[in-house]
C-alpha cells in the first residue's frame, strides 16, 4: 500500500504544471527523500514548498498522502482540508473528499 502511495505521489508531482523555481526544487527534494525513506526530510521540503506557494493545492495533496502513509490521521485530515480549500481542480477536490471520508470513518 505504501509503495503504491509513493508511486502515486511521484507521478502526481511529476505531472504538476504549477511548480516553478525554488518551490520546484523543494518538491524534487521531497520526492527524492520519499524514495529513500527519509520521510521527515520529505515533509520538511514540502513545508518549505508550502511557504513559497501557500495556496498550491498540489503541495497539500502530497503532504496528505505522505501523512496517510505514515498513519498520521490528524495531519492528513488537515492537509486534505487545505487541498480542498485551495484546489481549482474538481477532480482533485473529489479525491480529497474521498480520502477525508475514509479518514473520518476511523
Which residues fall in each region the model found?
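Canonical positions in the second alpha-helix
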Residues: 49, 82-83
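Canonical tetratricopeptide repeat
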Residues: 62, 95-99
Amino acid at each position: 500500500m505504501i509503495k503504491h502511495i509513493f508511486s502515486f505521489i511521484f507521478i502526481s508531482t511529476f505531472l504538476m504544471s504549477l511548480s516553478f523555481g525554488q518551490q520546484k526544487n523543494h518538491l524534487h527534494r521531497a520526492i527524492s527523500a520519499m524514495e529513500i525513506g527519509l520521510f521527515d526530510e520529505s515533509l520538511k521540503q514540502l513545508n518549505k514548498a508550502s511557504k513559497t506557494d501557500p495556496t498550491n493545492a498540489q503541495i497539500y495533496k502530497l503532504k496528505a498522502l505522505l501523512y496517510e502513509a505514515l498513519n498520521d490521521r490528524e495531519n492528513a485530515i488537515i492537509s486534505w482540508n487545505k487541498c480542498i480549500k485551495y484546489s481549482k481542480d474538481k477532480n482533485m477536490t473529489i479525491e480529497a473528499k474521498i480520502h477525508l471520508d475514509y479518514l473520518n470513518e476511523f
